[in-house]
UniProtKB/Swiss-Prot annotation:
Cell location: Cytoplasm
Family as reported in the entry's similarity comment: Belongs to the TRAFAC class myosin-kinesin ATPase superfamily. Myosin family. Plant myosin class XI subfamily.
Residue positions, PTM Phosphoserine: 1517
Protein name per Swiss-Prot or TrEMBL: Myosin-17
InterPro entries: Dilute_dom, IQ_motif_EF-hand-BS, Kinesin_motor_dom_sf, Myosin_head_motor_dom-like, Myosin_N, MyosinXI_CBD, MYSc_Myo11, P-loop_NTPase
Disruption phenotype: Impaired growth of root hair cells, twisted shape of stem trichomes, and irregular size, branch positioning, and branch expansion of leaf trichomes. Affected organization of the ER network and orientation of the actin filament bundles. The double mutant xif xik exhibits aberrantly enhanced organ bending, including increased gravitropic root bending XI-F. The xif xik abcb19 triple mutant has a stronger bending phenotype than the double mutant xif xik.
Chain's role: Myosin heavy chain that is required for the cell cycle-regulated transport of various organelles and proteins for their segregation. Functions by binding with its tail domain to receptor proteins on organelles and exerting force with its N-terminal motor domain against actin filaments, thereby transporting its cargo along polarized actin cables. Involved in the tip growth of root hair cells and in the elongation of trichome stalk and branches. Plays a major role in trafficking of Golgi stacks, mitochondria and peroxisomes during root hair development.
Domain notes: IQ domain mediates interaction with calmodulin. The tail domain is a globular cargo-binding domain.
Origin species: Arabidopsis thaliana (Mouse-ear cress)
Length: 1531
């Protein structure tokens, strides 16, 4: 990275900081080469200008998704961009074609669900937000399009998330090209399910990671010619063998050892295991358990994973038996023997573990002991056996343990590959490399040397690829780049792998000599590489050496290099294990042909690893590479912590900064012409105002500035390092001058405004004073006027009160007089009205009773007469029964008569009921009146008695009074009054008695009349029942005849000629109607002279049946031929659906057990819609299918349902004719098809339902399926048509350069018109489909459903694209999409609710999201306002995504406040366990949103009467019933 060349006072810069790596500040002083800056933490620091880098103050607050878009591509800019994105949970960032993945240390399931895969499928690179799926998509599409293998290299240090990234890559690749594997498992599933097994045996706890992979893994996914996965293979590299025998605190050995020690008790007992602390290979470290990990559960999970990958129970037992043997082998210790340089087992404990180890390995314990402490040397003269000292014996033990474990791991890998299966015919692969990253610890040994050697090779490959991409970019833009050079690490690789003379070669050479030590090896390195720049010798060290790698200098300790490089294959060990009685153990050590000639063979791990690495590099070189760099943001493995120093070190080690250095060696800053002019156009406004080409304008601007060394490509401006800072400095100067001019004008304006305000205030003050004086004067005048008015009103009030009292008294007197007169008049009229009502009721009752008598007599006479006539006609019909034509006519007449008699019977019943009710009511009324009168008579008698008694007492008391006192006139008058009153009461009593007597007589007469009526009613009922039974018998006979005809017709269609030959009938057989025309054969009646047709020969029966079949086939062919054409519509009713329905109903096809007409109709529909793009045909059949389905839904019912026919009775006949007649009587045709022919088909609600057989019900189901299919095809066709337009509608096209300059209103108007062109295209497509379905009379219900789902699709596509593309979450783009949505809203208004329905409501997500983008003052909005008022539909994840991706490209405003963002993050953390709620993308619903019941409820009734038959069948006699019904309806 080149230091900046243009730093001025006031510039914002990045300065190195020991704690934060880089810290930003503002330059306050420049003193030569020293820069004084005030940092954000409040300190003032001094730094060399070469180590200071400019900061882009206009960078988006959320960072950029591709760091090549950074204005300043340097180390602090990259680090700051990653930190800002990580704070917003944006863990993926591009650097060109490289993906940087920062481990979030938390679950983010919404980033990896199926819907997210669908979004990235087919999307171009960089079109959506950075994602691991985008890298896999690029690799897959490159493989498909170019036919070349691809590879994805995933690297990073332990804990950076390499394994999870690899899993996501595998998932997505399997999603694109997955196939079913063994037992229904996909290849990807099998590869992923192998992970637990490989992790158990190849992962361990290290200082930096609790689950660190101690081996490299390269997964090859093999694809066939169709792009589908056909096989896979897992290849592993450099398992850390030394960890088996040696670990440091607080690390752990491989997981499998601890899992086995935590196995169930019976397992531990079988393997004689216990606490891990008891085993030497495990107790070298004090760490035995991992936090949050249950080793017992992990052990069971590992066993289940082994089952899944195909490892049998026996093999599993053998694997863990070998693991247990290694643990016991580690506890075998040695002591000095009696002889010199000899060794023996140390104690009985060692003996015990040796015996257990031998038992587990199924080998001889004595031979194992000899193999550990003895060596056999073969010379030409003799075989020499020598013993080993304790240290050598321990080394032999450890070598055996490492060899066994290494072979076991290799066997597991081979077993997994065999289980997955490989495709030898595959020509293309996608390889996923999950390998360890660059490592540098305090103590670095042979493992770190090999790992860093691997990373050097990969870095060389990476550098070549990055430089190649730079070259391709320069070549594409046609600029001069030949002088550009980049740093290569070839010298480091030569230092390591050069042969002879490299580190590995010298190490192998030292291992070949038994007397070599780590000191001699180190001295050899010092002598060989003393002049190499990349090799240094640390001071005060005799065994350490340092190599300057691309990621930094690493110091290695050579103490254990020799031991770790030796891969002993001791002949004694080989022979011991080959002789094992366990085939599994023996199979781990196959005897190779070259090993038979020598007892001991030396193998170098370094050389072998070098060959493996060379093979890997050859594989990678033959593929197109793609890079993913995983970064661990902190060492505490917790979310939301970003340690700058840790991350910057990983960026250096991962080659990201190396890629930046390569880019900086050429042209690190690349800007399109539009972006360059938009940013730096202020430096030369005259260039923008001129009508120049963009490239010419950029050249003129750069020439005016005087910049040198730049290059202009075809579409971009390429700037050298530091030139962007120089341009920004000049731009800042221009903007500063402009700001000062604006401030000067602003201050002048503010001063003028303040003066005007003061002047206005003075004027207002004066006006207020004068106004106050005027108000006081007005108030005095107002009070005087009010006093006068109050006096006037008071006097008026007193006078009015006096007047009102007088008026009230007068009215009261008048009211009393008028009320008395009115009450008298009312009483008189009430009495008169009551008398009139009584008279009217009595006369009405008498007249009504007489009328009822006459009516009943008439009905009885009519019923008797009609019954007699019916019996007479029945006898006549029986005589003519053999005549088929006469029988049919008689049947029709009898049907009429039956209906009429039924009506009469029902009328008689109703009259009888009404008569009984009237009689009951009359009787109740009479009883009530009689009771009332009786009570009145009793009260009158009691009153008379009381009055007589009072008169008697008065008379008895009268003489003494007369004697004692003079006779007074008043007493005489009172006596006379009492006497007259008594006489009046007597007369009233007599009248009441007379009335009661009259009522008794009337009641007796009514009872007598009631008895007579009851008798007459019983007689009438008995006659009606008899008549009803006669009618039913006639109906049964007619139905039997009809049933026989129907059965004979069915038998004629079903039975074979042979069976018809065997059948003999003694009964007569009537010629049946054909189901095609409903008439009798030959147009009339055929009878023999004796009115019967005897069945004597088979041929006489075959001829009419053959004719029936042929006629039926002809009619069906004609119908199918007719409906295969476009029959159009009769009004708003589809002709084809109505014709099909009427034909099927007339032919009774719904009621037959076997027919082919349904299959032929379905086949016709299927043939018509074979072309999925013909929307005209699809809309035509959508209308017909819906109408026909509606008719079937309202007509058919399943067989066995309750019949609606009231005359149906169960029959006990067990004969075939009886059962058939019973079934036929349950159908509406049993009442007489002639009734339908005569009356025609009326509204569907007036028709009775048909008991449908299985073929009819199946036809209805097939028709429903075809309706759903046609609906889906129309909907999907419209989706396909608008999908490309939606991709253009989500982002506003860039405006022309004219919009950058003021005074271009006309050009802006033209540009604005062009902006909505895509939206108008969508509107045009919607109108086209709407008009098409209107023209074909598609049901509005289905049209609404189509457009509702289409608008939902638009909502999903626009909303998801908005959330996945940061460039779309801008203010101007929100305005653009809002204008487009207004077009769709206008379309909904024009389409009306009948066809658009609730389609506009389906856009609620994108409407609210766009509304959020275009609102002002977002930082002032609270979270409650946003969630409740602005965006109530959007989830918190969606709001967080929009808020963090928003950027204002128009006014430069910011998104919501940091507090709102923090609250959103808290709410998301609370919902982190809910995978559904974590997803911020929407799903498109492609289901069928309606049922048959919905169609039946939503569609109007269809009247099929007035449908005119098509010309093709109009003149055919077989379809005459269509014309007959039409004529009947018109008449």
């Amino acid at each position: 990275m080149v230091g900046p060349v243009n730093i001025i006072v006031g510039s914002h810069v990045w300065i190195e900081d020991p704690g934060a790596a880089w810290i930003d500040g503002e330059v306050v002083k420049i003193n030569g080469e020293e820069v004084h800056a005030h940092t954000t933490n409040g300190k003032t620091v001094v730094a060399n200008i070469a180590n200071v880098f400019p900061k882009d103050t206009e960078a988006p607050p959320g960072g950029v998704d591709d760091m090549t878009k950074l204005s300043y591509l340097h180390e602090p800019g990259v680090l700051n961009n990653l930190a800002m994105r990580y704070e917003l949970n944006e863990i993926y960032t591009y650097t060109g074609n490289i993906l940087i993945a920062v481990n979030p240390f938390q679950r983010l399931p919404h980033l990896y669900d199926t819907h997210m895969m669908e979004q990235y499928k087919g999307a171009g690179f960089g079109e959506l937000s950075p994602h691991v799926f985008a890298i896999a998509e690029v690799a897959y599409r490159a493989m498909i399009n170019e036919g070349k293998s691809n590879s994805i290299l995933v690297s990073g240090e332990s804990g950076a998330g390499k394994t999870e990234t690899t899993k996501m890559l595998m998932r997505y690749l399997a999603y694109l090209g997955g196939r079913s594997g063994v037992e229904g498992r996909t290849v990807e599933q099998q590869v992923l399910e192998s992970n637990p097994v490989l992790e158990a045996f190849g992962n361990a706890k290290t200082l930096r990671n609790n689950n660190s992979s101690r081996f490299g893994k390269f997964v090859e996914l093999q694809f066939d010619n169709c792009g589908r996965i056909s096989g896979a293979a897992v290849r592993t590299y450099l398992l850390e063998r030394s960890r088996v025998c040696q670990i440091s605190d607080p690390e752990r050995n491989y997981h499998c050892f601890y899992l086995l020690c935590a196995a169930p008790p019976e397992e531990r007992e079988k393997f004689k295991l216990g606490d891990p602390k008891l085993f030497h290979y495990l107790n070298q470290s004090k760490c035995y358990k991992l936090d949050g990990v249950d080793d017992t559960e992990e052990y069971l999970a590992t066993r289940r994973a082994m089952d899944i990958v195909g490892i049998s129970e026996e093999e599993q037992d053998a694997i863990f038996r070998v693991v247990a043997a290694i643990l016991h082998l580690g506890n075998v210790n040695f002591a000095k023997g009696k002889e010199i340089d000899s060794s023996v087992l140390k104690d009985e404990k060692s003996r015990y573990h040796l015996d257990v180890c031998a038992e587990l390995l199924r080998c001889d314990a004595k031979k194992m002991e000899d193999a550990l402490i003895k060596r056999v040397m073969v010379t030409p003269e003799e075989v020499i056996t020598r013993t080993l000292d304790p240290d050598s014996a321990t080394g032999s033990r450890d070598a055996l343990a490492k060899t066994i474990y290494s072979r076991l791991f290799d066997w597991l890998v081979d077993k997994i590959n065999n289980s997955i299966g490989q495709d030898p015919n595959s020509k293309t692969i996608i390889g996923v490399l999950d390998i360890y990253g660059f490592e540098s610890f305090k103590i670095n040994s042979f493992e770190q040397f090999c790992i860093n050697f691997t990373n050097e090779k990969l870095q060389q490959h990476f550098n070549q690829h990055v430089f190649k991409m730079e070259q391709e970019d320069y070549t594409k833009e046609e600029i001069n780049w030949s002088y550009i050079e980049f740093v290569d690490n070839k010298d480091v690789l030569e230092l390591i792998e050069k042969k002879p003379g490299g580190v590995i070669a010298l190490l192998d050479e030292a291992c070949m000599f038994p007397k070599s030590t780590h000191e001699t090896f180190a001295q050899k390195l010092y002598q060989t590489f003393k002049n190499y720049k990349r090799f240094t010798k640390p001071k005060l060290s005799r065994t350490s050496f340092a190599i300057s790698h691309y990621a930094g200098e690493v110091t290695y300790q050579a103490d254990l290099f020799l031991d770790k490089n030796k891969d002993y294959v001791v002949a004694e060990h080989q022979d011991l294990l080959i002789a094992s009685s366990d085939t599994f153990v023996a199979g781990l050590f196959p005897r190779l042909p070259e090993e038979t000639s020598s007892k001991t063979k030396f193998s170098s791990i370094g050389s072998r690893f070098k060959l493996q690495l060379q093979s890997l590099m050859e594989t990678l070189s033959s593929t197109e590479p793609h890079y993913i760099r995983c970064v661990k943001p902190n060492n505490v493995l917790k979310p939301a912590i970003f340690e700058n120093v840790n991350v910057i070190q990983q960026l250096r080690c991962g080659g990201v900064l190396e890629a930046i250095r390569i880019s900086c060696a050429g042209y690190p800053t690349k800007r399109t012409f539009y972006e360059f002019l938009n940013r730096f156009g202020v430096l030369a406004p005259e260039v923008l105002e001129g009508n120049y080409d963009d490239k010419v304008a950029c050249k003129m601007l750069l020439d005016k500035i005087g910049l040198k060394g730049y290059e202009l490509g075809k579409t971009k401006v390429f700037l050298r390092a530091g030139q962007m800072a120089e341009l920004d400095a000049r731009r800042a100067e221009v903007l500063g001058n402009a700001a000062r001019r604006i401030q000067r004008q602003s201050r002048t304006f503010i001063a003028c405004k303040e003066f005007r305000a003061l002047r206005g205030a003075a004027i207002v003050l004066q006006s207020n004073c004068r106004g106050k004086l005027a108000c006081n004067l007005y108030e005095e005048m107002r009070r005087q006027a009010a006093a006068v008015k109050i006096q006037k009103i008071f006097r008026r009030h007193i006078a009015r009160e006096s007047y009102l009292r007088i008026r009230h008294s007068t009215i009261t007197v008048q009211t009393a007089l008028r009320g008395m007169v009115a009450r008298n008049e009312f009483r008189f009229r009430k009495q008169m009205k009551a008398a009139t009502i009584i008279q009217a009721r009595l006369r009405s009752h008498l007249t009504h009773s007489y009328y009822k008598q006459l009516q009943k007599a008439a009905l009885s006479t009519q019923c008797g007469w009609r019954s007699r006539v019916a019996r007479k006609e029945l006898r006549t019909l029986k005589m003519a029964a053999r005549d088929t034509g006469a029988l049919r006519e008689a049947k029709d007449k009898l049907e009429k008569r039956v209906e009429e008699l039924t009506w009469r019977l029902q009328l008689e019943k109703r009259q009888r009921t009404e008569l009984e009710e009237a009689k009951t009511q009359e009787y109740a009324k009479q009883q009530e009146a009689l009771e009332t009168m009786r009570l009145q008579v009793e009260e009158a008698n009691a009153a008379v008695i009381r009055e007589r008694e009072a008169a008697r007492k008065a008379i008895e008391e009268a003489p003494p009074v007369i004697k004692e006192t003079p006779v007074l006139v008043e007493d005489t008058e009172k006596i006379n009054s009492l006497t007259s009153e008594v006489e009046a009461l007597k007369a009233s009593l007599q009248a009441e008695r007379q009335a009661a007597e009259n009522l008794r007589k009337a009641f007796s007469e009514a009872e007598a009349r009631n008895s007579e009526l009851a008798t007459e009613l019983e007689n009438a009922t008995r006659k009606a029942d008899q008549l009803h039974e006669s009618v039913q018998r006639l109906e049964e006979k007619l139905s039997n005849s009809e049933s026989e005809i129907q059965v004979l017709r069915q038998q004629a269609l079903a039975i074979s000629p042979t069976s018809r030959t065997m059948a003999t009938r003694s009964k007569t057989m009537l010629l049946p109607r054909t189901p095609e025309n409903g008439n009798y054969l030959n147009g009339g009646t055929k009878t023999t002279p004796d009115m019967t047709l005897a069945v004597r020969e088979p041929e006489s029966e075959e001829k009419p049946q053959k004719h029936l079949n042929e006629k039926q086939q002809e009619n069906q062919d004609l119908l199918v031929k007719c409906i295969s054409q476009n029959l159009g519509y009769n009004g708003d009713k589809p002709v084809a659906a109505c014709v099909i329905y009427k034909c099927l109903l007339h032919w009774r096809s719904f009621e037959v057990e076997r027919t082919s007409v349904f299959d032929r109709i379905i086949q016709t529909i299927a043939t018509a819609i074979e072309v999925p793009d013909n929307n005209e045909v699809l809309a035509y059949w959508l209308s017909n299918s819906a109408t026909l389905l509606l008719l079937l839904q309202r007509t058919l019912k399943a067989t066995g349902a309750a019949s609606l026919t009231p005359q149906r009775r169960r029959t006990t006949s067990a004969s075939l004719f009886g059962r058939m007649s019973q079934g036929l009587r349950g159908s509406p045709q049993s009442a007489g098809l002639s009734f339908l022919n005569r009356q025609g088909l009326t509204k569907l609600d007036d028709l009775r339902q048909v008991e449908a057989k299985y073929p009819a019900l199946l036809f209805k189901q097939q028709l429903t399926a075809f309706l759903e299919k046609i609906y889906g095809m129309i909907r999907d066709n419209l989706k396909k048509e608008i999908s490309p337009l939606l991709g253009l509608c989500i982002q506003a096209p860039r405006t022309s350069r004219a919009s950058l300059v003021k005074g271009r209103a006309q050009a802006n108007a033209v540009a604005q018109q062009a902006l909505i062109a895509h939206w108008q295209s969508i509107r045009k497509s919607l109108n086209s489909y709407l008009n098409l379905m209107k023209a074909n009379n598609a049901p509005p219900f289905l049209v609404r459903k189509v457009f509702t789902q289409i608008f939902s699709f638009i909502n999903v596509q626009l909303f998801n694209s908005l959330l996945l593309r940061r460039e779309c979450c801008s203010f101007s783009n929100g305005e653009y999409v809002k204008a487009g949505l207004a077009e769709l809203e206008q379309w909904c208004i024009e389409a009306t609710d009948e066809y658009a329905g609730s389609a506009w409501d389906e856009l609620r997500h994108i409407r609210q999201a766009v509304g959020f983008l275009v609102i002002h003052q977002k930082p002032k909005k609270t979270l409650d306002e946003i969630t409740r008022e602005l965006c109530p539909v959007l989830s918190i994840q969606q709001l967080y995504r929009i808020s963090t991706m928003y950027w204002d490209d128009k006014y430069g405003t910011h998104s919501v406040s940091s507090d709102v963002i923090a609250n959103m993050r808290v709410m998301m953390t609370e919902d982190s366990n809910n995978a559904v709620s974590s997803s911020f993308l929407l799903d498109d619903d492609s289901s069928i949103p309606f049922t048959v019941e919905d169609i039946s409820k939503s569609m109007q009734q269809v009247d099929v009467n007035d449908i005119e038959p098509p010309q093709l069948i109009r003149e055919n006699s077989g379809f005459g019933f269509l014309l007959t019904r039409k004529e009947g309806s018109t008449s």
